[in-house]
Amino acid sequence: AGAQNVLLPIYLDVQEQWPEASYDYAYSANVLHIMPDKLMAPFFAGVGKILKAGGLCCLYGPFKYKKKFTSESNANFDLWLKNNNPLSGIRDIEVVVSLAARNALSLVHDREMPANNQLLVFKKQTSCREVSKNS
């Protein structure tokens, strides 16, 4: 609130043109499980494009691990999501990490958060060598 070195949020639509700019940080909360799964690839392509080398992307929300839910409540939430929109649903972390890696983003932290959510932190690689070393 009132910080002079932090920009106001920039709202992006994965189906629209993204700005020709570069940023140090991107944050998305409770989005991947709401959007249709076919939009995850353009999401990561956009993030990979706008982040500076060494920049961070933080994703907050529920995820599955090896196709398994982390809790019964997440399994129920996934059913609810799919009843409202069959193209939505809690995403597999392995798919998320793979899509991120295709866009020079490496997972550096995976933290448990309240209410069966995770905070995933991806770092934009600084060179081709760093990408191949971490993939």
Where are these regions (language model features)?
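S-adenosyl-L-methionine
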Residues: A1-P19
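Polytopic transmembrane helical bundles with strong interfacial aromatic enrichment
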Residues: Y11, Y25-S28, D110
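Short glycine-rich, flexible loops that bind phosphorylated cofactors or substrates
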Residues: W18, I34-M35, K66
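A short SAM/SAH-binding and catalytic strip from SAM-dependent methyltransferases
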Residues: D24-A41
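A short glycine-rich, Lys/Arg-flanked "PGG" loop and its adjoining helix->strand segment in the class I
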Residues: A41-A53
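Conserved beta-strand signature within the Rossmann-like core of class I S-adenosyl-L-methionine
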Residues: A53-K66
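Conserved Class I S-adenosyl-L-methionine
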Residues: T70-E94
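Core SAM-dependent methyltransferase catalytic element
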Residues: A104-S135
